[in-house]
Swiss-Prot record:
Part of the 30S ribosomal subunit. Forms a tight heterodimer with protein bS6. The gene is rpsR. This is Small ribosomal subunit protein bS18. Keywords: Ribonucleoprotein, Ribosomal protein, RNA-binding, rRNA-binding. PANTHER family: 30S RIBOSOMAL PROTEIN S18 (PTHR13479), SMALL RIBOSOMAL SUBUNIT PROTEIN BS18M (PTHR13479:SF40). One of its GO terms (cellular component) is cytosolic small ribosomal subunit.
């Protein structure tokens, strides 16, 4: 995010608000070979759903696009077979 700061001679200078280095995200499912994305693995699927039962987006979980599609399909299958609830908290 850039912010414009007024200089003494009324010209604007672009200043970057971010400090430090941006951490590179590594897919948590690609590093662990033990955990396979399967609709029967409810412990794994529950880590990628919110408290209300919604599927968390990639920007929050850090999962790559390929694994996110597999996760989505596995969660939908598990919901259909009643292994994972559609919603967990009462709204």
């Amino acid at each position: 995010m850039t912010k414009k700061r007024n200089n003494f001679n009324d010209s604007y200078v672009s200043v970057n608000n971010r400090t430090g280095f941006k951490r590179s995200k590594v897919c948590p499912l690609a590093t662990s070979q033990d955990e396979d994305i399967d609709y029967k693995n409810t412990d794994l699927l529950s880590r990628f759903t919110s408290d209300y039962g919604r599927i968390l987006p990639r920007r929050l979980t850090g999962v790559c696009a390929k694994k996110q599609r597999k996760l989505r399909l596995a969660i939908i299958r598990a919901r259909f077979l009643a292994l994972v609830p559609y919603c967990t908290k009462k709204v």
